[in-house]
Structures are given as C-alpha cells and as structure tokens.
Design a protein with these regions (language model features):
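Functional beta-strand-loop-alpha-helix junction segments that form "active/interaction loops"
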Residues: 231-260
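A long, amphipathic alpha-helix that forms part
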Residues: 258-264, 280-314
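A glycine-rich, aromatic-flanked flexible loop/lid motif
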Residues: 229-241, 267-282
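Extreme N-terminal starter segment of soluble prokaryotic enzymes
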Residues: 1-5
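Active-site nucleophile/metal-coordination loop of metallo-enzymes that catalyze phosphate/sulfate
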Residues: 11-160, 164-167, 191, 199
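Single conserved hydrophobic/aromatic residue that forms the stacking wall/gate
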Residues: 315-325
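Active-site regions of oxyanion-processing enzymes, predominantly non-cytosolic
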Residues: 143-146, 186-188, 260-280
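Extended, H/D-rich, highly charged conserved domains that either
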Residues: 159, 167-233
Length: 325
C-alpha cells in the first residue's frame, strides 16, 4: 500500500457496542435511527460503500459493490474520543479517564483561577450549546469564564470572543491541562463563541488539549519507518504533533474534505488522517436528526471522490434521536 486515507466520522455509529449498558447506550444505532427519523436517506456513496449491509438503514440497499465492510467494537475501556482515536491508531488502553458528573473539585478550579487570574461560572454537566445560552449573558457582564463537562472526561471552558481572545483562551486551557493531569482528565477543550443573547454560536476555533498517547500508535510507527503523515482537523489535539509531518485546521466537514482531496492530489504524504466533527458538534448534541441528515449529505458528496482509497471508520455516538444530557 503506497498511500492510505483514514477518515473518522465523529458520532456516526452503526449499532450498540457490547458494553453499551455501561454507558446508558442500549438501543443506540445512530445511522439507523437517523434514517428512521427522516423517513429514509438518499446517500448514494454511503450505499455504494456498503453501509446498508452493516446495519438496517432506511433508503440504503443491503449490498456491497465496491468495498470491504465490517463493524468493530472497542477493546479499550472508555467511550470517549481520545480512547476511540487511540485504539483506531493501534493503542489499547485499560484505564478509563475520570468523569465528573457533579462538576469538578473546588481545589482544582481554585488552582487554575489562582494562576490564570480568571474566575469561573457553571461547573456542571451540560450541553455546550445549552450552557452558553444559560450563562452567556452572565459571562458577558461579569467576565467570568463558563466551565462545564459532559459524559466524557472533558474540562471545557467557553468564552465569548469579545470577552477573551482566542489566543488567551488557549493559554488558559494550556495551563488548565497541567492541573487536570493529576485528576486523570482526558481533554481540556477551548470553546470560543460569538453572537448576542439568544443567538450565541460556537465557532470552529475549538481546540482540544489532550494527553500524549502512552504508547506506540500508527503515527509513531509510520514516523519511525520514514513515512510522512498529515493530520487534518483535531488529530494533532488527540495524538500530539510529534509524529505528524503537518497538521491542518478545518472549518467544518465540507472544508475538511476539500482539504483532504487537495492534499491527496498534491501527493506529498503517505498517510492522511482526518476527523470530521460536524455531525457530532452541530447535530448530534443538539438532537437534530434533520440537520444530521444534511451533514451526512455533505460527507456523502465528499466521499464520492475518494472511494478508491478509503479506509473509513466511525467513532462513538452522539445520536440526535437520544437525549444525552
């Protein structure tokens, strides 16, 4: 194999995993349930790739014409993005990251506040879109940063760009990352947003501050064998950039796929690793199956140009037909 493209589509699951009961996910099947919610789907590329043969998806034929398809379950403990990406990259982990359903310890927040000079509001389990609507006005008037978590091991800090610059938000998250290490927190996430009350919107300048993988991955092995790897999207946030030849930020799935196609045609890399986030960020967490279908159409169109070189993988759920919070 001279070149490989690995695409991770955030949240697009094809059925519950064997350990679904541990995470409250019995009955989950994101692709199938989105199809049910929309009547049926018209996704010719996904159909060509054989997704209708993996699980029952209204509108997609149960046949495989140009690919080899299958369904995998994680061997690692945990169901978060970091764990899933690491395992796709060849690193199995046996220790769950810590989660904080009741909020983070006051001593952790006090340490971060003391060093950064910023106070926090929130500190509870919430959807990102919901919490900026709930606390956005208070944040604008007080200057205090919005802190929240989710079902994953994430320490998320949201700030309006008129209150805190993106660079300063990144600096605060980088400091927070150091303190979060001792609490076994998987990711610190910067969540900048814009807009006015009633119309707050998160931007694509999100940045994840993860943990360096504690073992070998496909990226480290390729690097040691003289191969060049390109990370597109949040790959460098989850794996670090030590073994990437280059890393490119994206402004959504359409932009990410356009970058992938352009870079592939330039033929400068051996391994192309991309993460597509819109289904998760824009539609899954907002419980919007109609929007999710529109997002699938964008991906379907982009994949049409890549069928002959795809190594397609899906990771975790944030299913718009199932409440997450």
């Amino acid at each position: 194999m001279s070149k490989c493209i690995l695409i991770v589509i955030d949240s697009l699951g094809v059925g519950e995993a064997p350990d679904a009961e541990n995470y409250g996910d019995i009955g989950a099947n994101t692709f199938g349930n989105v199809a049910k919610a929309n009547g049926q789907l018209n996704l010719p590329t996904f159909e060509k790739l054989g997704f209708g043969a993996i699980t029952n998806i209204n509108g997609l034929k149960d046949e495989v014409t140009c690919s080899i398809v299958g369904k995998l379950a994680e061997s690692s403990k945990g169901n978060d993005s970091t764990t899933g990406h690491w395992e796709i990259g060849g690193l199995i982990t046996q220790r769950d990251f810590s989660v904080f359903p009741k909020g983070f310890p006051s001593e952790l927040i006090d340490k971060i506040s003391s060093e950064t000079g910023h106070e926090f509001i929130g500190n509870y389990h919430a959807s990102g879109t919901e919490i900026i609507n709930e606390l956005g006005e208070e944040h604008l008037s007080s200057g205090k940063l919005i802190l929240y978590t989710s079902g994953d091991s994430v320490f998320q800090i949201a700030a309006h760009e008129n209150i805190l610059s993106i660079d300063d938000l990144y600096k605060i998250c980088k400091i927070s990352r150091e303190y979060c290490n001792e609490y076994n927190i998987g990711r610190v996430i910067a969540r900048p947003f814009i807009g006015d009350k009633g119309n707050f919107q998160r931007t694509y300048d999100r940045k994840d501050f993860g943990i360096t993988p504690p073992g070998e991955t496909i990226l480290s092995q390729l690097f040691k064998n003289g191969k060049n790897s390109l990370g597109i999207g949040k790959i460098s946030d989850l794996f670090g950039d030590e073994f990437l030849s280059n890393s490119i930020h994206t402004e959504g799935d359409k932009n990410g796929l356009e970058i992938l196609i352009s870079e592939y045609e330039d033929n400068r890399y051996d391994f192309y690793f991309i993460n597509l986030v819109d289904l998760d960020m824009l539609y899954g967490h907002r419980e919007d199956p109609a929007g999710y279908y529109e997002g699938l159409k964008i991906i379907d169109n982009g994949l049409d140009k890549l069928i002959s070189v795809l190594n397609l993988s899906l990771i975790h759920i944030s299913e718009p037909t199932r409440p997450l919070y």
